[in-house]
Amino acid sequence: MFKVDLNSDLGESFGAYKMGMDEEILKFVSSVNVACGFHAGDPCVMDETLNLAKQNGVCIGAHPSYPDLLGFGRRNMQISFEEAKNYALYQLGALFGFAKAKGMKIQHFKAHGALYNMAAIDENLALALCEAVASFDENIIFLGLSNSAMNEAAKKKGLRYANEVFADRAYNDDGTLVSRKLEGALIHDENLAIKRVIKMIKESKVTSINGKEIDLKADSICVHGDNAKALEFVKKIKENLKKEQIQICALENFI
């Protein structure tokens, strides 16, 4: 039987600003990526997010970013190897404090936004992130874009790697994600998106925005719970995976 993880970004509210439908999305996913304060999230939000994850039996992961609250971590920054490593360690430590206090463990590490996209093509940046994870806890799974520089970096640092794919994003011919700034970056046809997800899991292939067949591996599918429509889409994905006899489970069960 095929196995796959469903992951979603959570804990992205900040102070008086609320973002996402965290409580609702937790009913459908097996892993969550918790914002660690650099792009979103704050101590109280992190505390509440972990409480919700624990109540729902969902595994948690660190979701670190460039230090970019105003830009929600979606703006690129030129930083050194040491800076990247230290930013990652700092944010891992923040999540670890709450996790330890609640008797929870960090299952995985997934970079956010521009940091994720850059680490997918910049092996030096990817190595800095992997070195941070390996020095913090070598049992943490590194979750990153399938067939990217992060995969190679994780191998070099002796980390387990989970290949991530996206249900609603278009791919370039080289396997990277089409920039959100470009037309066609997001797939709005839910039925098409679900067919693509099943193909990625069962055939390890996806069709690029230019019609090219790309090889990739799908260990985890990133889904979103920003609004009611997004939640319904996640529900449809889960229902269709079950119909296809694809088991949904957290990464720690098969990576």
UniProtKB/Swiss-Prot annotation:
<dbReference type="GO" id="GO:0005975">
    <property type="term" value="P:carbohydrate metabolic process"/>
</dbReference>
<keyword id="KW-0547">Nucleotide-binding</keyword>
<keyword id="KW-0378">Hydrolase</keyword>
<protein>
    <recommendedName>
        <fullName>5-oxoprolinase subunit A</fullName>
        <ecNumber>3.5.2.9</ecNumber>
    </recommendedName>
</protein>
<dbReference type="GO" id="GO:0005524">
    <property type="term" value="F:ATP binding"/>
</dbReference>
<dbReference type="GO" id="GO:0017168">
    <property type="term" value="F:5-oxoprolinase (ATP-hydrolyzing) activity"/>
</dbReference>
<dbReference type="Pfam" id="PF03746">
    <property type="entry name" value="LamB_YcsF"/>
</dbReference>
<comment type="function">
    <text>Catalyzes the cleavage of 5-oxoproline to form L-glutamate coupled to the hydrolysis of ATP to ADP and inorganic phosphate.</text>
</comment>
<keyword id="KW-0067">ATP-binding</keyword>
<comment type="subunit">
    <text>Forms a complex composed of PxpA, PxpB and PxpC.</text>
</comment>
<dbReference type="InterPro" id="IPR005501">
    <property type="entry name" value="LamB/YcsF/PxpA-like"/>
</dbReference>
<dbReference type="InterPro" id="IPR011330">
    <property type="entry name" value="Glyco_hydro/deAcase_b/a-brl"/>
</dbReference>
<comment type="similarity">
    <text>Belongs to the LamB/PxpA family.</text>
</comment>
